[in-house]
Amino acid sequence: MTDMWKTEGMAAVGAPMDRVEGRLKVTGGARYSAEMPVANVQHAVIVQSTVANARITSIDTATAEKLPGVVRVLTHHNMPKLSPQAGKPPASRFLTLLQDDIVYYNGQPIALVIADTLEHATDAAHRVTAKYASARPVTDMRASNRVSYAPESNGRKPDSTKGSVSAGLADADVRIAATYTTPIENHNPMEPHATIAAWEGDKLTVYDATQYVIGDRNTVAKTLGLSPDDVRLVSYFIGGGFGCKGSVWSHVPLAAMAAREIGKPVKLVLTRRQMYGPVGARPETEQKITLGAKRDGTLTAVRHDSVSHTSRFEDFLEPSAMQTRMLYASPNIETSHRLVKLDLGTPTYQRAPGEATGTFALESAMDELAEALHMDPLALRLKNYAEVDPDSGKPWSSKSLRECYRTGSERFGWSKRSATPGSMRDGDVAIGYGMATATYPTNRQKASALVRLTGDGRGGVRALVQTASQDIGTGTYTVMTQVAADALGLSVEQVRVEIGDSRMPPSPVSGGSMTAASTGSAIDVVCRQARSELAAQGVTDLTSMGAYLDRQPDRSLTVRADSAPGEDARKYSMHSFGAVFVEVRVDRELGEIRVPRVVASYGAGRILNAKTAHSQLIGGVVWGLGMALEEETLVDPRTARYMNADLAEYHVPVNADVGTLDLSFVEEHDPYVNPIGVKGIGEIGITGVAAAIANAVYNATGVRVRDLPITLDKVMEKTRV
């Protein structure tokens, strides 16, 4: 037998292992929330408002209620009242729907139809009519009469001041100031939001497509006035989330309340169009960057002022200026965040919230400063490389950004770039090179896990690991299997990981790129603790391990443990970094922009699975391409209606839009970040990409586009070449 304690080489961790649930998914065996086998389930369909900023004066459900198969139609007139705690922080006021006649945004649920089939429920929903007393909605964040305000701090202060930017600008030889905008963007996961709610007495089971099993359970319990112990939340497989499934939206408690009202399970699945408005989006931003520098490129002043929109009824802040506080060394850095209320649904987190939008502005401005200084953009960034965190003054737990710059620039061929806009051509096609810095914080929260080692009666051993985490398509099942196998000294074939059930030990949200760091650390800790307990009993190898377990009354050993950030989290600043280089080709006659290649290099700590990690980078970079060139949610200013609320008119990149992606990691060892040395890579891939493309478009055409997306009309309107 293999020595149980021999972990040199760590064959399980780091290997490009295929997804353990892959066969289930491709054969249809993986059951998503809408597919869970629940007997006698009834179907619910939401009726949405057609206006915003209004009150319902009347709502007619009589015709719908008479249709075949209709069980109930719920409105604010007959919906049971929620718990007084519903909608209070940290929960959203989105959850208090069908409680009164107020309509905040177009598409807000105003009724819920329950019927025996989806077809019957859909037909009846179309027969519900409402009348409103409405005022013209406010949808333009950049209106001249807008009122902006500083949101209350929820852990991160909206404003920051280091030194004096005014003094730094006075000391500068070169100054630039520019305003950059990003539009509303929607998540568009392949799987829409879906919920099945089933009661058994006073106990509630909810199958929901969620990024946060424990948080979802707690919010549902609070909203309905239940104990969390009386709510079971299950989410075994999720078809993408990207942030919109990290919060509980109104459809979840609506399904639960409907099920309680009719005494039968209720299934509620949103349509694609219903994914626009009721479940959040990335908010619009307007960001002003002011930079000052000496002739040699030394930054003397950095200012980043960001404004984003929120809903009329609650605050959500897009923290676009956060990375500006820590990315470049300068004695004078000031940032601010302001909100503007609009008659739209509340925005929410979307892949790299803050950093995705913020790096577009900051990294575009850095290139504009480089142009004003007649300096290479990469050289400017290296000139202002931050050896410590400029915001906190703390040392980095690790930082490999210099190596990322070197590796990325060499693989890309950055030295061949011509600094003169429009000078690189291939016939009627203008070629441009651009680059940007990528960054994302390393987040970690407390997590718990359980391991049960079982003997098979013949000296063999199997391990079951449980934690209430969730796999949103990132490979959590697979990576956690590798972590457990490595910590136990077992093969991956001997390990089974179970997640997605609130009855398991709690884990945090799958967001903020923290699952590997949080849940992975908990699994590593509990498995090593189990190994230590076995060692105390004289177990020295797999043979003695199996024999020991076979002698136990139930042939097993069960251990549960927690893992949480410690003192190192207070001593060090923890971030992932990367460098993105892109080539664009712009048709000089048509303005069409193509991105034939992206080369990017990242330093993100220990890589747990080379294949899933590379997959995450591909996804992030493709998201960056969409952000730069295609994605924009359009709102009708007259009605506040989303005008392109489907995948036909909301444009996202397809295979034909994506060129060669050369994405790599530099080796990075971080002994301080967490027990397994990982930083998380789910979001860094999108950061910097939009700016690199904008910078490349300028290099190709001489046109500086500061308003995303960069569409051909914006290029043709100002083209100089």
Language-model features: where?
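Flexible, low-hydrophobicity surface segments
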Residues: M1-N154, R175-A178, H251, E261
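Thiamine diphosphate
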Residues: F237, G241-G263, K267-V269, T476-A484
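C-terminal catalytic domains of large/alpha subunits in multi-subunit enzymes
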Residues: L67, H76-N78, G225-D230, R260-L268, ...
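Helix-loop-helix junctions that connect adjacent transmembrane helices in secondary transporters/permeases
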Residues: R146-L224, Y385-R462, R641-F665
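Extended active-site and interfacial segments that coordinate phosphate-rich ligands
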Residues: V20-L24, H126-P137, Q211, N218, ...
